[in-house]
């Protein structure tokens, strides 16, 4: 990714697929705490999308990034939490505060927004067939809106294309679980019954 500064996305549906290139991208290895924390210290907004079981492993990078940020600026940092996890904001807050001093906890409460997101876009585990000759290709469904918790932002809410700030956010979470997730489960069960391997088939 650092060599090409771009990666291909393939929108898939029952009608076929469309390829687009996502450009002007940089990457940081999460194992490099210095680089990761510098990115966090200087960013306008950040997000997590690592999976609920991996969340605890990125906490040290976030904590170090926050410390650097607080030493340089009073600007708030909003962290959009893109994890399929109930109460993800409370869980991440607990993990982060375990590593903060009392003084740092006060800064955290004043300057860090933990913004839950309702993940609607499906991104399956990428098979070799899906990669289609490019290990960086990502296959996704076309739906691209990201509802987020409006009330959780600190400072101004950023204007980002397809970001949907909303409150009360609990509505979006419940709707997603009872309608969106149910729809995918139903498709998977019925597809398995007729021998299909992927929902998009």
Residue ranges and their predicted role:
Residues 1-23, 27-201:
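Substrate/ligand-engaging "lid" and interaction regions
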């Amino acid at each position: 990714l650092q060599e090409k500064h771009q990666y291909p996305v393939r929108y898939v549906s029952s009608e076929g697929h469309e390829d687009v290139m996502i450009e002007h991208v940089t990457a940081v290895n999460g194992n490099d705490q210095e680089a990761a924390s510098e990115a966090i210290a200087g960013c306008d907004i950040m997000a997590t999308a690592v999976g609920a079981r991996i969340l605890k492993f990125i906490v040290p990078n976030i904590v170090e990034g926050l410390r650097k940020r607080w030493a340089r600026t009073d600007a708030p940092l909003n962290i959009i939490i893109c994890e399929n996890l109930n109460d993800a904001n409370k869980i991440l807050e607990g993990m982060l505060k375990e590593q903060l001093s009392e003084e740092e906890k006060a800064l955290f409460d004043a300057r860090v927004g933990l913004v839950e997101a309702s993940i609607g876009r499906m991104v399956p585990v990428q098979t070799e067939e899906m990669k289609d000759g490019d290990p960086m290709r990502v296959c996704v469904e076309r739906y691209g809106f990201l509802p987020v918790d409006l009330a959780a932002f600190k400072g101004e809410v950023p204007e980002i294309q397809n970001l949907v700030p909303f409150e009360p956010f609990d509505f979006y979470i419940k709707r997603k679980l009872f309608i969106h997730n149910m729809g995918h489960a139903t498709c998977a069960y019925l597809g398995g019954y007729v021998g299909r391997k992927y929902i998009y088939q």
